[in-house]
From Swiss-Prot:
Disruption phenotype: Reduces total NAD(H) levels by 22.1% and increases the NAD+/NADH ratio by 20.4%. Modest decrease in the ATP pool. Extended lag phase during growth in media. Increases susceptibility to erythromycin, but not to gentamicin, chloramphenicol, rifampicin, penicillin and vancomycin. It comes from Streptococcus pneumoniae serotype 4 (strain ATCC BAA-334 / TIGR4). Its cofactor is FAD. The keyword Coiled coil does not apply. One of its GO terms (cellular component) is extracellular region. Belongs to the class-III pyridine nucleotide-disulfide oxidoreductase family. This is NADH oxidase.
Length: 459
């Protein structure tokens, strides 16, 4: 029987642990360390909880210590790993306030990512084992269940008068939180250093649609601005950028995350952004040491190269692959496309692969084709929304490199999966033009937007 130690019980860790227990539990001893007090919190639902679009946080958990131990794992919660002796294969952790040593034969990192801490004048950021705290009251981070709970508790305390909120960061989390706070009746300003929201996921013509959507719902955009300082007498009163000053009562820092690889200790090869560099079996540069989820690299099929794409969907898949290989059952990952989506005030946006800007930066002779149309024939008078699609492809090989879609019709979310597979399998734009796509007025048009975008692609 092999002894496998897992460091971290986040999405990747939970997927990894469950895969090992469900398939190879009789063959292995599984020991888990996690520095948090809870397991499997769905951070993607945090904004829904804060914005009161769901009843509470209970449904945002899908596993816990008891469930994992019932399957046969030994789980240590509130137990940060302090160091690892890779030569002697020993993990040192803090368990119930005491030093605890655990030997291993295989080691799996599922340590996730940590919030990026921007240097901001007037507020000192204190980093602890589990959370980040700011010395100025009402400067908040968003990552853990505890972070969301703290924000909700503060907003529920009417005596604090937290009516004006600045969200720093215009990525997915920042945009979702801006919507959540506005739904609570708060005055919201969204600040980002770049001149658009959702930068990197969509090209600018698409991000402008989301920007207009936010402004139409009374969210003020302060784009292309760098936060310089947060001012206040003990608590937040003002946020200062290089262009403006905003009177606010709370600041949410959502500028992004970086891989949590502090335990590498200079022994494990890291990617350029600090992530564990892994192969397609999720193994690091040290034999028998694996890394899964946000702490590790992935193989990007669009770039045809190693990359870093932190998504829960990638975390689950890499967790499964890492589990098989750590248990001695060889399995290679097939790579990812970075498929993603967002829904704000009923405007749905999905994308996969590379944007045109990213494709050119990656060295492709890239161009795009697009099409705007109704989802269904014009005679379908109800629930018939406009759809915009963009397909990015390489002019030399004709291979599809990426796709973006936006609509108030949620049905587009399924279409992006086809493009994800197309990128993975190196499908050309010309083959897509003749792909068998069914037609029924309840769903689409005989010449639907996917077909038309491909047919009108540059030759």
């Amino acid at each position: 029987m092999s002894k496998i130690v897992v460091v971290g019980a986040n999405h990747a860790g939970t997927a990894c642990i469950n895969t090992m227990l469900d398939n190879f539990g009789n063959e292995n001893e599984i020991v888990v360390f996690d520095q948090n007090s809870n397991i499997s919190f769905l951070g993607c639902g945090m904004a829904l909880w804060i914005g009161e679009q769901i009843d509470g946080a209970e449904g945002l958990f899908y596993s816990d210590k008891e469930k994992l131990e019932a399957k046969g794992a030994k789980v240590y919660m509130n137990s940060p790993v302090l160091s690892i002796d890779y030569d002697n294969k020993v993990v040192t952790a803090e368990v119930e306030g005491k030093e605890h040593k655990e030997s291993y034969e295989k080691l799996i990192f599922a340590t996730g990512s940590t919030p990026i801490l921007p240097p901001i004048e007037g507020v000192e950021i204190v980093k602890g084992n589990r959370e980040f705290k700011a010395t100025l009251e009402n400067v908040q981070f968003v990552k853990l269940y505890q972070n969301a709970e703290e924000v909700i508790n503060k907003l529920s305390d009417k005596s604090q008068h937290l009516d004006r909120i600045a969200v720093v960061g215009g990525g997915y989390i920042g945009v979702e939180l801006a919507e959540a706070f506005e739904r609570l009746g708060k005055e919201v300003v969204l600040v980002d250093i770049v001149d658009t929201v959702l930068n990197g996921y969509y090209d600018k013509d698409f991000t402008q649609m989301m920007a207009k959507n936010l402004e139409d719902h009374n969210i003020r955009l302060a784009l292309g601005q760098t936060v310089k300082a947060i001012e206040g007498d003990g608590k937040v009163e003002r946020l200062i950028t290089d262009k403006e000053s905003f009177d606010v009562d709370m600041v949410i820092l959502a500028v992004g995350f970086r891989p949590n690889t502090a335990l590498a200790g200079g022994k494990i090869e890291l990617f350029r952004n600090g992530a564990f560099l892994v192969d397609k079996k999720q193994e690091t540069s040290i034999p028998d040491v694996y890394a899964v989820g946000d702490c590790a690299t992935v193989y990007d099929n669009a770039r045809k190269d190693t990359s870093y794409i932190a998504l829960a969907s990638n975390a689950v898949r890499t967790g499964i692959v890492g589990a098989y290989n750590a248990c001695g059952h060889e399995l290679e990952g097939i790579g990812v496309q970075g498929s993603n989506g967002i829904s704000i005030y009923g405007l749905h946006m999905v994308s996969t692969g590379l944007t045109l800007e990213k494709a050119k930066a990656a060295g492709y002779n890239a161009t795009e084709t697009g099409f705007n149309d109704l989802q269904k024939p014009e005679f379908m008078k109800h629930d018939n929304h406009e759809v915009a699609i963009k397909i990015v492809f390489d002019k030399d090989s004709r291979e599809i490199l990426g796709a973006q879609m936006v609509s108030h019709d949620i049905a587009i979310s399924m279409g992006i999966h086809m493009f994800s597979l197309a990128i993975q399998e190196h499908v050309t734009i010309d083959k897509l033009a003749l792909t068998d796509l069914f037609f029924l007025p309840h769903f689409n048009k005989p010449y639907n937007y996917i077909t038309m975008a491909a047919l009108t692609a540059e030759k």
